[in-house]
Structure formats: structure tokens, C-alpha cells
């Protein structure tokens, strides 16, 4: 599989969709990743709480433990809009998918109508997050076709009918499904 273990990467820009809950409102967030030449680093921007800043280490370690080699490249992650405070670990999965997409692992169309939300354990397993039902309900209203969430949140997510729910146990399971879209 491209990018799995050894190999060359087609570096570039990739964008995925996610969401966060602020008070009683769901705010959509675009997670953008750019992987390119420069001093090797993993930098995140976009009005981030400490939990979101900590995602950098969770994502890098989870990717490595899922078998993906992090390239020695400059990787910049932007969570937008910048005016919305990003809180919690809900962005771990979308950050990982955006980075892997920027590495050329997935086709661009793989995530165009999909919303991703979930925390990553260091072993690459998805951990439950709070607020999945309101996120899924708003994703449905916004026209998303599918929500990719932790398997442990799947029952809650399925309470919102009329939108496909993919409950995954691991980052690798998510990646394999997106590669074949």
C-alpha cells in the first residue's frame, strides 16, 4: 500500500471535514494538511486548546503504530475557521486522515462528503468522544453522506437516521476503507 512502511510519498495538500461542539451549537471545522519541503516538523494552527495541541503527538504515534511512516517533511495542519475555538480530542482522527491524505495515501474524492470525528489512542485504536449525536445530526442537515466515528460511539451515531455511519475500531481500518473509495 502506498505510504505504508517504506516508499516514496506524493506530498501535497489535503482537506477533511470535522466538527466540534461549542456550548449548545455544533461548529463545522475544516482540517487542512500540507506536507512539503522544509525543516522536518509537525505544526498545528487555528485557535487550538491544549487538548488539540496535544493531538500532534497522539497522531504521530498512532500513525507509526498503525504502520505508516511519517516522512521527514514540513507538515502544517490548519483547523479552520480560525475564529472558532477548537477543543477536545475529536480532531485526532481527522488530523491523521488529513496528514495521510497529504502524503498521497487517499484519492481526493475519498473524503469530500464525509465527516470524521474521533480520538486516537497511541496504539492507533479509536477512543470514544462526547457529543457524537449532535455532530451527526448537523452533518446530516449539512448534506454529508457519511460520518466516520469510533466504533464505541456507533450506537449513538446511528440514532440519527438518514446518514451512513461507519464505526471504526482503528486508524488502519479507516485508512483501508478510504483507500478503496
Predicted regions and their residues:
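Peripheral, non-AAA+ core regions of ATP-driven protein-machinery
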Residues: 2-179
